[in-house]
Each structure stands twice: as C-alpha cells, then as structure tokens.
Amino acid sequence: SLITVLLATSYKQIGRLMFLFSLLTLIAILKGFWQKFIGFDAIEYDALMESGMYKTHLLPQITRYFSIFTDAGNYGSNMGFTCVLFGITGLFSKKPGLKTYYLCVSALSLYSMFTTGTRGAIVVPLGGLLLFALISKNIRLMSAATVGGICIYVFFAFTYAGESNYMIRRMRTAFRPNKDASYLVRKQNRQKLAEYLRDKPFGEGLGLGGVEARRFGNRLTTTIPNDSTYVKIWTETGIVGIILYLLIYAGSLLWGCYYIMFKVRNDELRHLLTALACGVFGMMLSAYGNAFFTQFPTGIMMIMFLGILMNGKYIDERLTIEKQQALLTATKKDSTL
C-alpha cells in the first residue's frame, strides 16, 4: 500500500496501470479458455490429483476451471472483480476504441466467472452494482444500477429460467442458501468454532486455521475447513484480530468513497476510482463466502487498489494543476500568434 501511494501519483499512471491490468486479465481468461476447450496440461492435472483439489474441481456435472490462479474460487471472484472494474471504466471512457476494448474484457470476465462454478463469485458484480448506485450521484445511473441489480437477484432467487444450464443452476444455489447442503455444513462449522474460540480473544494462532494447517498441529481449528476469509482470520487471530482487520479494510474503502463523492473534481478520475471502489467492495463481500481474499495475487491487488483510492485526493489535485498549466500554455501560444 505504501509503495502504491508513493508511486501511483498521477492519472496517467493509473490509466497505464489499468491497461496493463487488462492485459494480465486477458492472459488469465485465455488460460481459462484453454483449460475449458483443450484441457488441463500434465502439470495442472498432477497438481489437482496430488493436492486433493480434484474433489472440489472435477465434479460429476461440471469441471471448475482455475486458469493461472490458486483455485477456482480465487479465479471466479477475480473475474467478477474485473467484470465490474472494466465494465464501469469502459462505460465512462471517452475514447471509442478503449471503451469497446474494456467492455469486451468485462464481458469475457463475466463469462469466465461462470465457468469457474464459484457460487460466491456472483456477489462481486452484485456488490459492485450496489455501491455504484450509492456513490454515482447520478439519478439515471443510480436507477439503472438499482434496476439491473434487482433483475439479476430476482432472476437467480425467484425464477428457474436457464435451470437446464448447470452453471446457472449452480450459481442459483448462492441465492437459496437454506436449500444448499454445503451452506448448512459451513453454518454448523462456524457454530463449533464460535464455541471453541469463546475464551480465545486472540484466536488459535497464525497458520493454525483450516485443514491445510494440519501439518502444523492437530487441533479442532485444523479439522474444520475455512470456507470464508473472515472466518479464517477470526480463527487465527480471534475477535480482536477480525475487528482490526475489518476496520482497516472497511475504513480504507469508506475513506476512498468519501473522496470520490465529495472531494474529487475531475470526472475522468472519479469514474476510474469509482470502478476500483465498486470492484473492491464486491470482493470484500464475496470474501465472506470464499477463503480467497488473502491468497496470491488477490491480497496484493486489493491492497494496491485501496492505496490508489486513498491517494485519490492527491491525484485529483495534481490532475487539476496539470490541466491549469496546459490551459495557461495554450493561452500564451494563442496570445503570441
């Protein structure tokens, strides 16, 4: 975050970073398509077998693709993030070519999100739409985002349209948790952890949460899978740790949203920061149902984008000065002529 604040100090730098990030996103999408239409390579297949990931990724009715990420949950949520990020960026881009490019990346990201079979990933674009409706300060955009979000929710929660498609059917279970056996098991596991951690305000200890930590010790917290980033942090650092963690991340996001709504004067920068804020908010919501938020590269990316949000006021002031200097230079040239 500190490095981002020190280096990402101009609108042009943020624009270049966004374009570079879109290229990396396309690489991830293409790799996901390769896995879907051609298949896993030998290294990926061996990794699935040796790590036990085949139990959650090679399902009877669907194969969950993970591209270049650690698992399908990480890949799916990141595709939801890039769908929101480049969708909003493309929507407000003034350059026709760049607008088309970003909107295409957004659409490909949305499709890739569905190929992962990650139910919690659908929360990312929905959460992004929700925040967009709140901070856009544009009645038409707020109305469109609200209507769009409601339509998506109604489609998944109250209809059976597209039920023959397994990807849609699997995503639909995220909106009907009480009918989902996986959700009920997670709920029971959290109740067990709550009872166990009642007298441990600082948790069980770093690295001692989740079944992947069995090699470090055999205890209750290493026998229960952490299917949520927040549950994992709560298990390892206790109620004190999770409160501090949420305060830092939520505070940073709220700080950025405050600047977007009331301080940033340049529209092009406001739209870019809005896209980042909406994407990060969606990821934070999705982290409740998936333990991906601290994994590579998601953890680094979220800290980096929050750093840009918190640096928004300085970037805006610098952009204003650059515009004034450009206008002054143009005026001098005109007077000389």
Language model feature labels by segment:
Residues 30, 35-40, 113-116, 133-177, ...:
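A membrane-periplasm/extracellular boundary helix in multi-pass inner-membrane enzymes
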Residues 9, 18-31, 79, 102, ...:
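Transmembrane alpha-helices of multi-pass, membrane-embedded glycan-processing enzymes
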Residues 3-13, 87-95, 130-139, 254-262, ...:
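Structural signal for the C-terminal ends of transmembrane alpha-helices
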Residues 275-334:
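Transmembrane alpha-helices of multi-pass inner-membrane enzymes
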Residues 53-55, 59, 162-164, 172-237, ...:
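Long extracytoplasmic/lumenal interhelical loops at the membrane interface
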Residues 15-47, 53-61, 66-135, 257-258, ...:
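Alpha-helical transmembrane segments of multi-pass inner-membrane proteins
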Residues 66-67, 71-73, 109-112, 201, ...:
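A conserved mid-to-late transmembrane alpha helix and its immediate loop/hinge
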Residues 96, 100-101, 109, 130-133, ...:
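Hydrophobic transmembrane alpha-helices and their immediate junctions
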